A protein has these predicted regions:
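Phosphate/pyrophosphate-binding loop motifs in nucleotide- or prenyl diphosphate-using proteins
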Residues: 52
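Acidic helix/loop microenvironments that form the catalytic cleft of cell-wall polysaccharide enzymes
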Residues: 68-72
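Catalytic cores of secreted/periplasmic or lumenal enzymes
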Residues: 45
Length: 86
């Protein structure tokens, strides 16, 4: 299993390897649990939120330590695929 922040970090690294600029812009202040994002995942999570790769859980939270489901991984991977095709 992987956490949501691990999933996003993996996707950001793949995007960077594929030539996408993954420089983080903005912050995660809109999410009440932004402070729970690990330091290693902060830039990746910020990039993923601001590019639409990942969305919150619908309750104002990112749930970075929560387990990433297969559906969440498939959805975020498809969003990254769409970004790479643009």
């Amino acid at each position: 299993t992987a956490t949501r922040e691990q999933m996003v970090t993996f996707l950001a690294r793949f995007a960077e390897f594929s030539g996408v600029d993954t420089t983080a812009t903005g912050d995660l202040g809109d999410f009440t649990d932004a402070s729970k994002v690990s330091a290693y995942a902060e830039d990746a999570m910020t990039w993923a939120v601001h590019t639409g790769i990942i969305h919150g859980m619908g309750n104002g939270k990112l749930d970075p330590k929560g387990t990433a489901t297969r559906a969440q991984f498939a959805t975020t991977a498809l969003r990254l695929y769409d970004l790479l095709q643009a």
